[in-house]
């Protein structure tokens, strides 16, 4: 049975003549399968239908060489030698084979593209998972650093409070050593109320007595009281610090600032008063103070 040439087969399958000739020429006339592979790979190229450059043998006034006169099939047949004419049945059979080959090539191409798309999707998911893991690790590192920073700040705060307590204890020990006796006990004996009361306004006031110490009783909001002996020249801030450290709250618990009041005459001591000596504030030789929670400014 006579067969169609490669060019005729491609045209029979529906490819444009110019595109078929271009495919055969660019594949070196290696057969219909090579030409079909080229056509499928380049069917979307914008210049797929542009003609090839004119061969030298087609230049005006140039005679083709004997090798250029050979047909694209490379059969070497002499010019004018005719090929057998195909019957309609043979043409249909050959066209059917070519269409099956085209369908096979198309399936192979689709399968290849599907595999490539699947691989791209796997790569995208893999990159997404890696990005999610990296983001989660970054968040965990930030949370861990924040927790460590909070622990460090808490430890520094507790250490600062401990240093203040130790300073108070050292001051108490120094006062006890200097003046003798126990200082800082809540059950300290009450100081004797000094001086006689004048019987009449016209009576001469007694000579004012100088005191080196003063006894301060502090009444807390919960009904308990603290008693402490201070030097007369100590500032009122020492009394407030003593109250803040001994008012019975748990160590490390946030404590509200306190304000000191005198019962009679009624007086609220200001921040400026905290820098004044107890003697100057009239709290010597003894006084009773009331603790009130200070509203934050």
Curated annotation (Swiss-Prot):
Record key words, sorted: Acetylation, Coiled coil, Cytoplasm, Phosphoprotein
Amino acid composition bias (Basic and acidic residues), ranges on this chain: 86-122, 137-177
Gene giving rise to this polypeptide: Ubxn1
Biological classification of the source: Eukaryota, Metazoa, Chordata, Craniata, Vertebrata
Entry function: Ubiquitin-binding protein that plays a role in the modulation of innate immune response. Blocks both the RIG-I-like receptors (RLR) and NF-kappa-B pathways. Following viral infection, UBXN1 is induced and recruited to the RLR component MAVS. In turn, interferes with MAVS oligomerization, and disrupts the MAVS/TRAF3/TRAF6 signalosome. This function probably serves as a brake to prevent excessive RLR signaling. Interferes with the TNFalpha-triggered NF-kappa-B pathway by interacting with cellular inhibitors of apoptosis proteins (cIAPs) and thereby inhibiting their recruitment to TNFR1.
Organism annotation: Mus musculus
InterPro entries in UniProt: UBA, UBA-like_sf, UBA_UBXN1, Ubiquitin-like_domsf, UBX_dom
Subcellular location per the Swiss-Prot or TrEMBL entry: Cytoplasm
Residues with Phosphoserine modification: 199-200, 270
Protein name: UBX domain-containing protein 1
Domain of life: Eukaryota
Modification type N-acetylalanine: residues: 2
